[in-house]
Design a protein with these regions (language model features):
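Hydrophobic alpha-helical segments that form the core
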Residues: 110-112, 145-170, 176-186
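Helix-turn-helix
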Residues: 17, 21, 25-59, 63
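N-terminal intrinsically disordered/low-complexity leader segments
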Residues: 1-12, 195-196
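Amphipathic alpha-helical linker/stalk segments
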Residues: 64-90
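Helical hydrophobic small-molecule/effector-binding pocket
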Residues: 87-113, 118-122
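Amphipathic alpha-helical packing segments from all-alpha helical-bundle domains
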Residues: 73, 77-78, 100-103, 117-152, ...
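Amphipathic, non-transmembrane alpha-helical scaffold segments
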Residues: 11, 15, 19, 61, ...
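Amphipathic alpha-helical interface segments
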Residues: 21, 25, 93, 159-164
Length: 196
C-alpha cells in the first residue's frame, strides 16, 4: 500500500515538472506551433513519452493553462501583499511583473480564445474569479477599510494588469493603474489618520 502511494506521489511530482516544462515550451513556441514532439523534447522525454503522464494533448494544454493562471496569480498577489505598505512601489512592481509575465498571459489568452480549448478552460477561470473576494478582503484588512471600498480598485488593478500583459501597451495600463494608486493611497492615508 505504501509503495503505491509513494509511486503516485512521484508520478504527481513528475507530472508537475512536465507541466512546467510544457508551459515554458508553449510560451516560447505558441499554442498552435508547439508539437507533441516539442513538448517531449522540452520535458526531456522520448517522443510520445508525455502520454505516460497525460492522456491527450488537450489534457496537457489545460494543465498548462491552469499553471499559467497559478503563476500569474501567485506572482501578482505576492507583490501586492509584499509591497502594499508602499502603494507606488507596489504599482511599479506590478508593471514590471506584467512585462515579465506577458508571454505567459498571451499563451493563456490563446487557449481561452481557441475553438478547441476555450470552453474547457472556463472552469479554471471561474475558480480564479472565485478567489478575488479573498484577495479583496485581505487588502481591505491591511488598508483598514471595507471590502466594498477597495473592491473596485482591486478589480481595476486586475483589469489593468491583464490588459497590459495581453496588449503590451503602457497607454492602456498607466491611466488605470494611476487611478488605483491614487485611491489606494487615499484609503491607506485614511487608515493612518484613524490610527494616529
Amino acid at each position: 500500500m505504501g509503495d503505491c502511494v509513494l509511486r503516485e506521489e512521484k508520478k504527481a511530482e513528475k507530472r508537475q515538472e512536465l507541466v512546467d516544462a510544457c508551459l515554458d515550451c508553449f510560451v516560447e513556441k505558441g499554442l498552435t506551433v508547439a508539437t507533441t514532439k516539442d513538448l517531449c523534447k522540452a520535458a526531456k522525454l522520448q517522443n510520445g513519452g508525455i502520454y505516460y503522464y497525460f492522456s491527450t494533448k488537450e489534457e496537457i494544454v489545460l494543465a498548462c493553462a491552469e499553471e499559467a493562471i497559478s503563476r500569474i496569480e501567485k506572482a501578482a498577489f505576492g507583490i501586492v501583499f509584499e509591497d502594499i505598505s508602499d502603494i507606488k512601489s507596489m504599482t511599479d512592481h506590478l508593471g514590471e511583473l506584467a512585462d515579465k509575465m506577458s508571454p505567459t498571459m498571451r499563451f493563456l489568452v490563446s487557449v481561452c480564445v481557441s475553438r478547441e480549448y476555450g470552453e474547457k478552460v472556463k472552469p479554471s477561470l471561474v475558480r480564479l474569479a472565485a478567489r478575488y473576494p479573498y484577495y479583496t478582503g485581505r487588502i481591505a484588512e491591511i488598508l483598514g477599510c471595507t471590502d466594498e471600498e477597495v473592491a473596485p480598485f482591486v478589480h481595476l488593478s486586475i483589469l489593468a494588469i491583464n490588459n497590459y500583459m495581453i496588449f503590451a501597451e503602457r497607454a492602456l495600463f498607466d491611466p488605470q493603474i494611476e487611478a488605483v494608486k491614487k485611491e489606494l493611497s487615499r484609503l491607506a492615508e485614511r487608515k493612518g489618520r484613524n490610527n494616529g
